[in-house]
Amino acid sequence: MPIKVKVKGEELQEVSEHFAKLASPSFNDVLNFSIESQSLEEGTLKLDLRDELIGNPIFRVLHGGVISSILDIAGAHAVYLYIFKQVMGKPIEKKMERLGRISTIDLRIDYIRPGKGQHFTATSNILRVGSKIAVSRMELHNEDNVLIAVGTGTYTVG
């Protein structure tokens, strides 16, 4: 299932659609998340609980692997937004070359509490971007704004 993009603004729409195209078809399609970032400063992804994403069927909580995956994607999305700002106005070939380099090289996830809920929001922002790597911070909350997990991701950018 293709990744849905629900954003406002022409630039944000362009970068989010490009990110969605790069991320599909792949494992990301299994998660069936939507990109709902409201600015080029923070990545926001939404994910709904489905049976195939449950880790513990007795308590119906989100699987830990799903949590780490959505946080990793959110972190990469924040980096993608940041790099997109740097290459705005450049030819598409230059954009693709720079944006295509983004890849996870390290990921740390802290599970704060079980992934209870029906709707989840992953947010991410940039901690640092250098010439070779970028670091982002991510959080996952449920629909009641309960913090489920936090993460820090390191990504190649150069």
Stretches found by the model and what they are:
Residues M1-G158:
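Terminal targeting signals and extreme-terminal segments of soluble enzymes
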